[in-house]
UniProtKB/Swiss-Prot annotation:
GO biological process: tRNA thio-modification
Pfam families reported in the protein's UniProt record: ATP_bind_3
Gene expressing this chain: ttcA
SUPFAM superfamilies recorded: Adenine nucleotide alpha hydrolases-like
Species name: Cupriavidus taiwanensis (strain DSM 17343 / BCRC 17206 / CCUG 44338 / CIP 107171 / LMG 19424 / R1) (Ralstonia taiwanensis (strain LMG 19424))
UniProt EC number: 2.8.1.-
Subunit structure: Homodimer.
Reactions performed catalytically: cytidine(32) in tRNA + S-sulfanyl-L-cysteinyl-[cysteine desulfurase] + AH2 + ATP = 2-thiocytidine(32) in tRNA + L-cysteinyl-[cysteine desulfurase] + A + AMP + diphosphate + H(+)
Top-level EC class: transferase
Name recorded for this polypeptide: tRNA-cytidine(32) 2-sulfurtransferase
Function: Catalyzes the ATP-dependent 2-thiolation of cytidine in position 32 of tRNA, to form 2-thiocytidine (s(2)C32). The sulfur atoms are provided by the cysteine/cysteine desulfurase (IscS) system.
Keyword RNA-binding in record: yes
Cofactor entry: Mg(2+); [4Fe-4S] cluster
Cofactor note (record): Binds 1 [4Fe-4S] cluster per subunit. The cluster is chelated by three Cys residues, the fourth Fe has a free coordination site that may bind a sulfur atom transferred from the persulfide of IscS.
Length: 308
């Protein structure tokens, strides 16, 4: 399989972003056994490919075990993943659990199956990780998934909550990691096409229309078309939180402001920002000063004392 220079740049970017996420969040450590969850979709194929590449040159030793959960969906091509995983030389396990029948029995026709399906999958994955001695569980969620989840929780749950790149399971037995947290869905899709991964569609829930996640995803993609880079900016915001400028009394001691126990810089008190204001001009207008808008720019880092 021959590839262009554009492909190698794409591959390098994905590997670099994944390596940075692993380092930033301490996702993988020396001696870890990582259970790589394979659904047969573009995200999990890409995750495995990138992790295998990083494993070869990482300064630490860790083990990868690929896992696929055969949920007994009618028409599921059982041979595809075993053949692929064997061809790339990774240790793997196929776990059979008829979660499909349970979902179809419990969920009324026309209702979303995602929630129950996800809970059942988690249970099987955690049990498999324990049986195999895997202390890390890798999922294929990417940057766009994280931003999508943030808006879902905000719109429908009233919480500023996203999808963490790393978290512990409820019983503390395993750490769940998302190595593709810094990678865009667009890059992953391009990589999967170039690599010609044998993609397996999700027939159980993929055809259900008008789901909240689908609507939010469409909204974000429209924003991205109108203003390229917006999804990346939103993700950057999730990594640059200022608790004193929100309204959660659990995150910031607002009551302490009256007694000097908590402080906020004085510029913020008067609404000053670190944004650069630029003139807003209209098509055919010669007047560049009729209105101004705010454009985000990070404030320059303060120079050390004594710097000329």
């Amino acid at each position: 399989m021959s590839h262009s220079n554009n492909f190698y740049r794409l591959e390098t970017r994905l590997q670099s972003q994944t390596g940075k996420a692993i380092g930033d969040f301490g996702m993988i450590e020396d001696g870890d056994t990582v259970l790589v969850c394979m659904s047969g979709g573009k995200d999990s194929y890409t995750m495995l490919s990138v992790l295998m590449a990083l494993q070869k040159r990482a300064p630490i030793k860790f083990k990868l075990i690929a896992m696929n959960l055969d949920q007994k969906q009618p028409g599921f091509p059982e041979h595809i993943l075993p053949e692929y995983l064997k061809s790339v030389g990774v240790e793997y396990v196929i776990v059979e659990a008829d979660t499909y029948s349970i979902v179809k029995e419990k969920v009324p026709e026309g209702k979303t199956t995602c929630s129950l399906c996800s809970r059942l999958r988690r249970g099987v994955i955690y049990r498999t990780a324990k049986e195999l001695g895997a202390n890390k569980i890798a999922l294929g969620h990417h940057r766009d998934d994280i931003v999508n989840t943030f808006f879902l929780n905000m719109f429908f749950g009233g919480k500023m909550k996203a999808m963490p790149p790393k978290l512990a399971t409820d019983d503390g037995a395993h750490i769940v990691i998302r190595p593709l947290a810094y990678c865009s869905e667009k890059d992953i899709a391009s990589y999967a096409r170039a690599m010609e991964f044998p993609i397996i569609p999700c027939n159980l829930c993929g055809s259900q229309e008008n789901l909240q996640r689908k609507k939010v995803s469409e909204m974000l993609q429209e924003w991205e078309r109108q203003n390229p880079g917006r999804i990346d900016n939103i993700f950057s915001a999730l990594r640059n939180v200022v608790p004193s400028h929100l309204a959660d009394t659990e995150l910031f001691p607002f009551t302490g402001l009256a007694t000097g126990l908590a402080k906020v810089d004085e510029a913020s008190l008067f609404g000053e920002t670190t944004f650069q204001q630029q003139p807003l001009t209209f098509a055919g207008s010669l007047d560049e000063n009729r209105m101004e808008f705010v454009r985000f720019e990070r404030a320059p880092a303060a120079e050390p004392a004594g710097t000329p």
